[in-house]
């Protein structure tokens, strides 16, 4: 079983996409807002975001160890936060240039390492394509992981 990270700015469509993907893979869902709420930790500083990435990683690894596919959606704004999260497959939801929160916009570093690049808010279109790529015996056998928005 594997862990998928769906990352991007607030309002980009991460949760919507993850919610569309989960039933296609019979996956367990981890939503960063819900995990943060359960921990009652509303610190959005760099240190708070590291704690959140570690919490998300711990929860994802527990579900994976129980034999589940896991889809986690969270901002993962920095390379450090992304390194802390044990994703087997990374989806960058890159549909907006600025999110709702200025501090997050300032902190967010566009990912360099990802397996799929979503460029439009069309989760019903993207979810099956991502799941096909993810479950393909050799994902690189498909023409590209950066499918055009018209695909």
Regions inferred by a protein language model and the residue ranges of each:
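Pre-Walker A (Motif I) flank of P-loop NTPase domains
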Residues: 1-3
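Hydrophobic anchor at the beta1->P-loop junction of P-loop NTPases
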Residues: 6
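The conserved Walker
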Residues: 10
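Conserved lysine of the Walker
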Residues: 14
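Conserved substrate/cofactor phosphate-moiety recognition/catalytic segment
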Residues: 19-58
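Glycine-rich phosphate-binding loop used to anchor ATP phosphates in small-molecule kinases
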Residues: 47-97
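Conserved small/polar residues in nucleotide/adenosyl-binding loops
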Residues: 134-139
């Amino acid at each position: 079983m594997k862990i998928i990270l769906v990352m991007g700015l607030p309002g980009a469509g991460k949760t919507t996409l993850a919610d569309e993907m989960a039933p296609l893979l019979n996956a367990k869902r981890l939503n960063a807002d819900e995990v943060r709420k359960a921990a009652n930790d509303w610190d959005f500083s760099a240190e708070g975001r590291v704690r959140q990435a570690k919490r998300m990683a711990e929860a994802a690894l527990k579900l994976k160890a129980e034999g589940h596919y896991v889809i986690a959606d969270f901002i993962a704004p920095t390379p450090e936060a992304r390194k802390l999260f044990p994703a087997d497959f990374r989806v960058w939801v890159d549909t907006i240039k600025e999110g709702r929160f200025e501090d997050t916009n300032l902190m967010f570093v566009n990912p360099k390492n990802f397996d799929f690049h979503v460029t439009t808010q069309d989760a019903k279109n993207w979810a099956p394509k991502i799941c096909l790529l993810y479950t393909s015996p050799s994902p690189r056998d498909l023409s590209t992981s950066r499918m055009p928005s018209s695909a």
